[in-house]
Curated annotation (Swiss-Prot):
Lineage: Bacteria, Pseudomonadati, Pseudomonadota, Gammaproteobacteria, Alteromonadales
Active site: S517 (proton acceptor)
Organism expressing this protein natively: Shewanella halifaxensis (strain HAW-EB4)
Membrane spanning stretches: none
Catalytic activity of the protein: (2R)-2,3-dihydroxy-3-methylbutanoate = 3-methyl-2-oxobutanoate + H2O; (2R,3R)-2,3-dihydroxy-3-methylpentanoate = (S)-3-methyl-2-oxopentanoate + H2O
Official protein name in the record: Dihydroxy-acid dehydratase
InterPro entries (UniProt xref): Dihydro-acid_dehy_C, DihydroxyA_deHydtase, DiOHA_6PGluconate_deHydtase_CS, ILV_EDD_C, ILV_EDD_N, IlvD/EDD_N
Summary of subunit composition and partner proteins: Homodimer.
UniProt binding sites for Mg(2+): D81, D123, K124, E491
Signal peptide stretch: none
GO terms for MF: 2 iron, 2 sulfur cluster binding; dihydroxy-acid dehydratase activity; magnesium ion binding
Pathway the protein takes part in: Amino-acid biosynthesis; L-isoleucine biosynthesis; L-isoleucine from 2-oxobutanoate: step 3/4; Amino-acid biosynthesis; L-valine biosynthesis; L-valine from pyruvate: step 3/4
Domain of life: Bacteria
Pfam families named in the record: ILV_EDD_C, ILVD_EDD_N
Length: 615
């Protein structure tokens, strides 16, 4: 029988000092011997997805203590990618993932916690906590802050739905009046919660359901809705159940590595492809798999991308549907249910919400169940009232959306596309692969041949796009923005948004060793591996080169001879210490970022740190 980890600091005369300190935190005599449950919160007033989380830890703690545990809360950092976008702040976003993972590990191991509740929400926080959870391998459950309501406003007497990307595009589009731009800005992000489309934050929170580590509704129930309160309370009760199963009954199915195993990672990626999730999820799943010692690679993602149809199309791939609409259609359980009926899912994997995924789907897939309580749960809708308060409204749709022919979630027969929403491309530009979010690419652009327009940084690319250097037919190449070369692998939402604002969104392609915001759409190809700073071919592309992109064939090619390519590589290597560095780029890089760059791997490895370099 496993012994409570916390016994290390609570048992024995030699731990009198530790017990004295525990007592100073409120632990009583009869509490010693109970499991200590760590609550990793991520409240901050900087981030709308986290601004409402201050009291969530207390909710979870109350449920834990009622169930017989000791709850101890701590906080992690949380970076808002949208606010950090377009300036040097974005260099810190991806590296913050490793800091979050490390901080959770440090707190949990330093204090010998027995189990963990992760209260996350936005882009790097859920992945960082997921990496830590699989690294620690103690009972864990995730509960996120929930998505923001979609923005709504009336322009030209027409009611339109909005999100963050609309504000960015309008702000850069000279054809949009100042008044309309301001109106869109004021309406785009009306409430607390993670941005309202299928961007990185919501994608990752959905994937925790598929991995088996969070409760149904975690990825889709609005932050403002009163029903979300129960998810926090149930998370507290469930973590005590998981801890009891493991520590009292030696049930290893309660551990995250046995829940989020290889089959579960396949399920998560299958969901991601079916819902056209953010391309950033590829980075985070690869990184998390490595932490859990799961042999899940780009090859697996490529294989799945050829099998899974696109069943759920959400902003930014369409203005029609946002996360509130996904929830009405049954949320993640609705998508997983359709994948299960298409025989594309492993339904025998463990899940924190039931004995296995099949059991959870039987109870929570609105197509399978007539349970009135479940249908009521998924009818929770938006109020349309600006607020930063959680659980502030109890509005409901008249009915759930179970139309699998023309609704937000489709069956395989009526899929938006039989091709999934993400694809892995490879070729001489990206020998180790790159990622494109096909859900956001117009069908006519699935094959594209253009002339390279090379920029050594995102800043130069933005200036070039806004300055008219980029024209229809160009392939914008932004390099030295990978994990090592940036450092930090910046998101390229501004370049793609500015291409749209200049009417080039469907007339140009963009490839980069950086990454894209979940809000990106268009022919935007990121995660090019190896990155330029690691000797990748993208570092050898020259302006005017012909680049051929073929999504159906999963290929991306620099159309020059092997002899010419080899000659360019030889010339680059001859530069010695100046090889594989951006020409003329002036960028202040802090010591913290330099330390990150020393260990950073390319995107095909999840941009994790290569600790073998420390040996």
């Amino acid at each position: 029988m496993p012994k409570l980890r916390s016994a290390t600091s609570t048992e024995g005369r030699n731990m009198a000092g530790a017990r004295a300190l525990w007592r100073a935190t409120g632990v009583k005599d009869n509490d010693f011997g109970k499991p200590i449950i760590a609550i990793a919160n991520s409240f901050t007033q900087f981030v709308p997805g986290h601004v409402h989380l201050k009291d969530m830890g207390s909710l979870v703690a109350g449920a834990i203590e009622e169930a017989g545990g000791i709850a101890k809360e701590f906080n992690t950092i949380a970076v808002d990618d949208g606010i950090a976008m377009g300036h040097g702040g974005m260099l810190y976003s991806l590296p913050s993932r490793e800091l979050i993972a490390d901080s959770v590990e440090y707190m949990v191991n330093a204090h010998c916690a027995d189990a963990l509740v992760c209260i996350s929400n936005c882009d790097k926080i859920t992945p960082g906590m997921l990496m830590a959870s699989l690294r620690l391998n103690i009972p864990v459950i995730f509960v996120s802050g929930g998505p923001m309501e979609a923005g709504k406003t009336k322009l030209s007497d027409q009611l339109i739905k909005l999100d963050l990307v609309d504000a960015m595009v309008a702000g850069a589009d000279s054809r949009v009046s100042d008044a309309d731009s301001e109106q869109i800005e004021r309406s785009a992000c009306p409430t607390c919660g993670s941005c309202s489309g299928m961007f990185t934050a919501n994608s990752m929170n959905c994937l925790t359901e598929a991995l088996g580590l969070s409760l149904p509704g975690n990825g889709s129930m609005l932050a403002t809705h009163a029903d979300r309160r129960e998810l926090f309370l149930e998370a507290g009760r469930r973590i005590m159940d998981l801890a009891t199963r493991y520590y009292q009954h030696d049930d290893e199915s309660a551990l995250p590595r046995n829940i989020a195993n290889f089959k579960a990672f396949e399920n998560a990626m299958t969901l991601d492809i079916a819902m056209g999730g953010s391309s950033n999820t590829v980075l985070h799943l690869l990184a998390s798999a490595q932490e859990g010692e799961v042999d899940f690679t780009m090859d697996d993602i490529d294989r799945l991308s050829r099998l899974v149809p696109h069943l759920c199309k959400v902003a930014p791939s369409t203005p029609k549907y946002h996360m509130e609409d996904v929830h009405r259609a049954g949320g993640v359980m609705g998508i997983l249910g359709e994948l299960d009926r298409a025989n594309l899912l492993h339904n025998d994997v463990y899940h924190v919400a039931g004995s296995n995924l099949a059991d959870v789907l039987a109870r929570f897939d609105i197509v399978q169940t007539d349970d009135a309580a479940v249908h009521k749960f998924f009818s929770a809708g938006p109020a349309g009232i600006p607020t930063t308060k959680a659980f502030s409204q109890d509005c409901r749709w008249d009915s759930v959306d179970n139309d699998r022919k023309e609704g937000c979630i489709r069956s395989r027969e009526f899929a938006f596309s039989q091709e999934g929403g993400l694809a892995v491309l490879s070729g001489n530009v990206a020998l180790d692969g790159c990622i494109v979010k096909t859900a956001g690419v117009e069908v006519e652009n699935h094959t594209f041949i253009g002339s390279a327009r090379v920029f050594e940084s995102q800043d130069d690319a933005v200036a070039g796009i806004l300055g008219g250097e980029v024209v229809a037919g160009d392939v914008v190449v932004i390099r030295y923005e990978g994990p090592k070369g940036g450092p930090g692998m910046q998101e390229m939402l501004y370049p793609t948004s500015y291409l749209k604002s200049r009417g080039l969104g469907t007339k140009c392609a963009l490839i980069t060793d950086g990454r894209f915001s979940g809000g990106t759409s268009g022919l935007s190809i990121g995660h090019v591996s190896p990155e330029a700073a690691a000797g990748g071919t993208i570092g050898l592309v020259q302006t005017g080169d012909r680049i051929e992109i073929d999504i159906p064939a999963r290929s991306i090619k620099l159309a020059i001879s092997d002899i010419e390519l080899a000659a360019r590589r030889t010339a680059m290597e001859a530069l010695g210490k100046d090889a594989w560095k951006p020409l003329g780029r002036v960028r202040q890089v802090s010591m913290a970022l330099k330390a990150y760059a020393l260990l950073a791997t390319s995107a095909d490895k999840g941009a994790v740190r290569d600790t073998s370099k420390l040996v």
